[in-house]
C-alpha cells in the first residue's frame, strides 16, 4: 500500500526593513524554500494561504506591527469589467499575446529597464542588472510562463514589445508574479490591460482565479487592485470578498498581528505519496 507523508518545509523570518507600501513602517517576511519534486504541490497549497513566489522562495508578509498586506485574487467567473476597463480592452485590441517559456531576452530587459527608470527609479529593484533579471525570470521550480504583448510595427514582422508578465500556473488559477510595460504608452493603460487579459486567459483555461499579489489598505501604490470586481482577500485564515476597502483599516494596528509561532502552526501543508510499498 502507498503511504502519505507530510511535506514539512522549514520556515524562516527576515530581518525588518523599510516597508515599500506604508511610510514609516517596517516590513518582515515569513519564507520557505521552494525546491525539489514537491515544489509545485507546495506552491499550490501555500498560495491559497497568502504566500507568493519569488524565484525559488515562497514568502508571506509577517510584520511585527501590522497585517495590512492582504493577498488578493479575482473570481474569474464573477468578474464584470467596468466601463473604463472595457475601454482599456478595446484600446489594446491590436496587441498580440505570446506565451513563452520562462527565458529572459535582451528585449525584455530593455523594456524592464525603461519601466523601472520611469516608474520605480528609487525602488528596491532599480539596480537590477541583466543577470539578476534573468534569474528573476528563469529561476522557477514550478510551471511558469512569460506572457509578452507586442503592438503593430512598421512591417508585419516588426512588432515592438509593449508589455511583459511573468506568470505562474497554479492548480486553481494564474498568479501574476511581476509585470512591466512601455512607460511611453501611458494612454493605453497597459498595467490594467495585462490584468484584464490574464482574466481572459484564466477563463479560456477553465481556471477560477487570477492572483494579483497583495492589496494594502492605505497604500496608494496598491489601491488600484480594489477597482476590479469579484475581488477576494485572504484575511483571518480564509478568503472573503473585499467589501468596502475602508473596512480593513484595523489591519494597520499592532494588535492585529499574531505571534510568528502561531502563524506557522496554522499553515496547512500538502501531503506527498511515498514510493514505498508494504504488504498487509
From Swiss-Prot:
Which cell locations does it reside in? Cytoplasm
Q: Name one Pfam family in it.
A: ATE_N
Major place of residence = cytoplasm
Under the GO molecular function aspect, what terms does this record hold?
A: arginyl-tRNA--protein transferase activity; leucyl-tRNA--protein transferase activity
Alphabetized InterPro entries for the sequence: Acyl_CoA_acyltransferase, Asp_Glu_LeuTrfase, N-end_Aminoacyl_Trfase, N-end_Aminoacyl_Trfase_C, N-end_Aminoacyl_Trfase_N
Q: What is its EC number?
A: 2.3.2.29
Cite a GO CC annotation: cytoplasm
Record's signal peptide: none
BP-aspect Gene Ontology terms: ubiquitin-dependent protein catabolic process via the N-end rule pathway
Reactions accelerated catalytically: N-terminal L-glutamyl-[protein] + L-leucyl-tRNA(Leu) = N-terminal L-leucyl-L-glutamyl-[protein] + tRNA(Leu) + H(+); N-terminal L-aspartyl-[protein] + L-leucyl-tRNA(Leu) = N-terminal L-leucyl-L-aspartyl-[protein] + tRNA(Leu) + H(+)
Alphabetically sorted, this entry's keywords are: Acyltransferase, Cytoplasm, Transferase
Top enzyme class, one word, equals transferase
Regarding protein family, the annotation reads: Belongs to the R-transferase family. Bpt subfamily.
NCBIfam families cross-referenced by the UniProt entry: PRK01305.1-1, PRK01305.1-3, PRK01305.1-4, PRK01305.2-3
Role according to the record: Functions in the N-end rule pathway of protein degradation where it conjugates Leu from its aminoacyl-tRNA to the N-termini of proteins containing an N-terminal aspartate or glutamate.
**What is the name of this protein?**
Aspartate/glutamate leucyltransferase
Q: Which organism is it from?
A: Cereibacter sphaeroides (strain ATCC 17023 / DSM 158 / JCM 6121 / CCUG 31486 / LMG 2827 / NBRC 12203 / NCIMB 8253 / ATH 2.4.1.) (Rhodobacter sphaeroides)
Amino acid at each position: 500500500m502507498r503511504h502519505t507523508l507530510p511535506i514539512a518545509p522549514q520556515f524562516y523570518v527576515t530581518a525588518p526593513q523599510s516597508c515599500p507600501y506604508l511610510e514609516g513602517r517596517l516590513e518582515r517576511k515569513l519564507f520557505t524554500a521552494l525546491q525539489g519534486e514537491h515544489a509545485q504541490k507546495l506552491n499550490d497549497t501555500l498560495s491559497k494561504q497568502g504566500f507568493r513566489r519569488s524565484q525559488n522562495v515562497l514568502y508571506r508578509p509577517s510584520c511585527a506591527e501590522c497585517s495590512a498586506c492582504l493577498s488578493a485574487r479575482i473570481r474569474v467567473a464573477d468578474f464584470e469589467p467596468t466601463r473604463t476597463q472595457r475601454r482599456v480592452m478595446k484600446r489594446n485590441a491590436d496587441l498580440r499575446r505570446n506565451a513563452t517559456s520562462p527565458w529572459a531576452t535582451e528585449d525584455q530587459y530593455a523594456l524592464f529597464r525603461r519601466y523601472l527608470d520611469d516608474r520605480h527609479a528609487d525602488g528596491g529593484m532599480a539596480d537590477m542588472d541583466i543577470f539578476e533579471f534573468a534569474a528573476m525570470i528563469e529561476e522557477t521550480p514550478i510551471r511558469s510562463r512569460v506572457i509578452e504583448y507586442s503592438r503593430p510595427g512598421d512591417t508585419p514582422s516588426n512588432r515592438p514589445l509593449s508589455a511583459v508578465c511573468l506568470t505562474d500556473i497554479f492548480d486553481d488559477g494564474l498568479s501574476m508574479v511581476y509585470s512591466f510595460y512601455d512607460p511611453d504608452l501611458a494612454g493605453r493603460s497597459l498595467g490594467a490591460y495585462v490584468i484584464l487579459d490574464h482574466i481572459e486567459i484564466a477563463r479560456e483555461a477553465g481556471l477560477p482565479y487570477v492572483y494579483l499579489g497583495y492589496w494594502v489598505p492605505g497604500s496608494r501604490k496598491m489601491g488600484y487592485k480594489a477597482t476590479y470586481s469579484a475581488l477576494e482577500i485572504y484575511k483571518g485564515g480564509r478568503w472573503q470578498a473585499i467589501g468596502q476597502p475602508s473596512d480593513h483599516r484595523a489591519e494597520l494596528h499592532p494588535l492585529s498581528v499574531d505571534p510568528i509561532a502561531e502563524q506557522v502552526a496554522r499553515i496547512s501543508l500538502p501531503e506527498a505519496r511515498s514510493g514505498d510499498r508494504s504488504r498487509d
